[in-house]
Amino acid sequence: MTQQTFLVEIGTEELPPKALRSLAESFAANFTAELNNANLPYGEVIWYAAPRRLALKVTNLSATQADREVEKRGPAIAQAFDAEGKPSKAAEGWARGCGITVDQAERLVTDKGEWLLYRAHVKGQSAQLLLAGMVNTALSKLPIPKLMRWGDKDTQFVRPVHTVTMLLGSEVIPGTVLGIDSDRIIRGHRFMGEPEFTLDNADQYPQVLQERGKVIADYELRKAIIKRDAELAAQKIGGVADLSESLLEEVASLVEWPVVLTAKFEEKFLAVPAEALVYTMKGDQKYFPVYDTAGNLLPNFIFVANIESKDPQQIISGNEKVVRPRLADAEFFFKTDRKKRLEDNLPRLETVLFQQQLGTLRDKTDRIQALAGWVAAQIGADVNHATRAGLLSKCDLMTNMVFEFTDTQGVMGMHYARHDGEAEDVAVALNEQYQPRFAGDDLPSNPVACALAIADKMDTLAGIFGIGQHPKGDKDPFALRRAALGVLRIIVEKNLPLDLQTLTEEAVRLYGSKLTNTKVVDEVIEFMLGRFRAWYQDEGHSVDTIQAVLARRPTRPADFDARVKAVTYFRTLDAAAALAAANKRVSNILAKSTDKLNDHVRASVLKEPAELKLATHLVVLRDKLEPVFAAGQYQEALVELAALRETVDEFFESVMVMDEDDAVRVNRLTLLSKLRELFLQVADISLLQ
């Protein structure tokens, strides 16, 4: 069977840079699925992506599908014919679907009966006949939120398409893809190399495109070149480039032929907070900032051109001219904002709505101020500093700098607070109030910042849930999932003595009569416990371990963490599986029983040695573990409880729980309930699988 290389390249207008990788990866995944569905053997599917093209190369693709034997079992003979031996409607319908008549069907005989059988040898189709359709299907399933039309055609795609190249070996695969007939023509760089040329065979790609068209189609190669050359460029000026992964990805998606260049700006701009300068360079211009070895911003930046120029200095000068006005704006805003104190912006917060039913940002500030003070008192932070941070928390939103450079919120509050002489932990709290912003982000670094961050997030959670605007599906406009996880991470990882019940109640209380949802406290807590579940699953804890702990509905996050870790450790013990099974058995027995249990086990009613032994063991453990439970030492408690295994096994082997004697039965059920209560001090281990 002949094997060849297949190439498809879709030549387009500039594709969305932030979506380029996902488009290419999805194209490859979709086409791979099509190959598998079509039963076309292949070697490897390799994707390529550049600003004006998506391409796939499939190695060792079979020229035809493999022949296959098809078998379709029909109705049983008893249902296939009536009493007179005539085919039933079911048999005729089945035969028609197979393209035969009933009398052409074979018989399948097994020890379970006899059925009609269709058997055929299906010859594999040529790959040439299948590939165009498979490409169309793969493209139609790309994750494109908004499609566009172009020209006078009804065809829709993420961007206008100009060329479609499909080659199997050296042969053009005929077909129409996205309204374009396939050919062997590909286009090169807009300004370098050959603007258009033909491919002789699929194996030439992408090397010939790089040599003749001055386009590096290999996404990872472009990214590696940019990273390598930017690091070298920074070293030449004694610095280190800020090569964040997200910006590297975006820049690699913007250029077909990366050329790394170094530029500079006036040193006077370094008086402006570095965050504002970096925001301009990275966010607006897609430049890489450069720092010295001490982490201070240098008056240089590295950028990537999409062309090899005979006069690179001209490109450098052009970029320096572009960025200078933006830096000058930042300098002006910074100087202007500092002409008044941060606190002077408070009245302007009354003009900005937080949410229609929940009031203005000034209303939110007042609530945050009170809640931050309350949280600070609970965790031993400076209450005065926490309330001060709460009062100033949203003031920087009214500054010129944050209005123009929105991503600098928080950090500009810190700089302005320092300028005003505020306490350092207050200033830092203003910067860190939004942390953690994403999974893996840093947590607030001091107790005042923790109090402010928790207060800000809990106020939003209480308010939005309080008016019934819960997150639905993928829609979460107020980022409540992120807020909930942020609160939990701060409490757990900082080991703060906070209870979600009282914390939520306090956040709700501060809204007064604004909230309409009477179940807001319970709903916020359930939502946060749900985020706990997702977080700990991501951390590698099993679902049933988390469920076992959640069954106790622990509302202190640090306590939840300790319980989950204790149960996870317990599962490594030899006795764990047997005790989990025993707890499940106990749970089922108690659930089915209609007897009213005693308050305590009556020693006088105990008859069997095994139940006496269990009762004695439970009394000893209960007294021993009371201070252990109180201290939250759940792992130690479960290790002690694991010693019950032998005693519990003996009990179930030799004692009839559901005795005919009412007093004996109720006493034994009470004994089992006391056993279960001990384990429930940690978790419901009957839920462990």
Swiss-Prot record:
Name of the top EC class for this enzyme: ligase
Primary localisation category: cytoplasm
Keywords: Aminoacyl-tRNA synthetase, ATP-binding, Cytoplasm, Ligase, Nucleotide-binding, Protein biosynthesis
GO terms of molecular function: arginine-tRNA ligase activity; ATP binding; glycine-tRNA ligase activity
PANTHER family registered for this protein in UniProt: GLYCINE--TRNA LIGASE, CHLOROPLASTIC_MITOCHONDRIAL 2, GLYCYL-TRNA SYNTHETASE
HAMAP family cross-referenced by the UniProt entry: Gly_tRNA_synth_beta
Quaternary structure and partners: Tetramer of two alpha and two beta subunits.
Name the UniProt record assigns to this protein: Glycine--tRNA ligase beta subunit
Taxonomic lineage: Bacteria, Pseudomonadati, Pseudomonadota, Gammaproteobacteria, Enterobacterales
Protein's gene: glyS
